[in-house]
A protein has these predicted regions:
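Acidic/glycine-rich phosphate/pyrophosphate-binding loops and surrounding catalytic core
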Residues: 1-212, 217, 226-234, 239-240, ...
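Active-site glycine- and acidic-residue-rich loops that bind
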Residues: 138-140, 245-248
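Glycine-rich beta-strand-to-loop/alpha-helix junction loops that act as flexible
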Residues: 220-221, 241-247, 265-267
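Active-site loop ensemble at the mouth of alpha/beta enzyme cores that anchors a bound cofactor
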Residues: 278-282
């Protein structure tokens, strides 16, 4: 089992534990154990569908006898009235898995929809939209999957798969040069092949990075579009560039047209609205 699947399985198990506890007494009290039925996932809002594959895992993990028929796959554009899948099996199982499946699919689809909207805003530029670590605790793997489904690019998954020297790291390390030098020495000593990105707050810090080198990407933190254009010119294609901080949907293209390679948007995962859908007997 790979790490991603292990995280998803643990999330599903924890979610069932917190929701069902010692039993779904509503369902157990009024639905016979032998009752069989089927329910459909009905889309009620236009957007990008995400989470179908995870939903299948929710059903399989709770009750392997449930039969799932998928009509619309992850990444597809959906409209109100569409039926994404039909699930058949024990009615008790349908009722006990309904809320977890909807919670996951609505959130993932909301993230994919917003990401798609942001990436569409960048059409005609080479800039790609990035997610961040501003995710729901325990759900990061699903939220980052949704960003990819929506057409965005995953930044680092966590603190373990990339070195990102933020302002606090630089300040505590004693400056740009010490932060970069120590990061490179650490990777060499530990045998880690990690990309190094550094955040700069002004042109002086940017020039220090350019003079020292040793990084893969430079992040411009809270730069205006005018500052960003100048910063991109200073970098001159030597390193990947990223804009971050206070960038909204309305200002997104202004930054992209400055020539940055990436724009990171925390709102993709921390301020998203779930896509409306329901799971009803059919």
């Amino acid at each position: 089992m790979n790490k991603e699947q292990e995280l998803i399985d643990r999330l599903i198990d924890l979610a069932f534990a917190e929701d069902i506890g010692d039993g779904d007494h509503t369902t157990l009290s009024c639905i016979p154990e032998t009752a069989m039925g089927k329910s459909k996932l009905l889309i009620k809002e236009a957007g990008i569908l995400a989470g179908i594959e995870v939903a299948k895992e929710v059903f399989r993990r709770f009750d392997p006898t449930m039969k799932v028929t998928v009509y619309i796959n992850d990444g597809a554009e959906v409209k109100p009235g569409a039926v994404a899948m039909i699930v058949e099996g024990k009615v008790q199982s349908l009722l006990q898995t309904e809320r977890l499946m909807l919670n996951i699919m609505q959130r993932m689809s909301g993230i994919a929809t917003m990401t798609h909207k942001y990436q569409e805003r960048l059409k005609g530029t080479h800039t790609r939209v990035l997610d961040t670590r501003k995710t729901t605790p325990g759900m990061r793997i699903l939220e980052k999957m949704a960003v990819k489904i929506g057409g965005g690019v995953n930044h680092r998954i966590g603190l373990f798969d990339m070195i990102l020297l933020k302002d606090n790291h630089v300040d505590f390390a004693g400056g740009i040069d010490k932060a970069i030098t120590r990061a490179k020495e650490y990777c060499k000593a530990k045998g880690k092949d990690l990309k190094i990105e550094i955040e700069v707050r002004n042109f002086d810090e940017l020039q220090q990075v350019l003079d020292l080198g040793g990084v893969d990407r430079i992040m411009f933190d809270n730069f205006t579009p005018e500052m960003t254009r100048k910063a991109v010119e200073m970098v001159g294609g030597r390193y990947e560039t990223e804009s971050s901080g206070g960038i909204t949907f309305d200002t997104l293209r202004d930054y992209a047209e400055c020539g940055v390679d990436f724009i990171s948007v925390g709102a993709l995962t921390h301020s998203v609205k779930g896509l409306d859908m329901s799971f009803k007997a059919c």
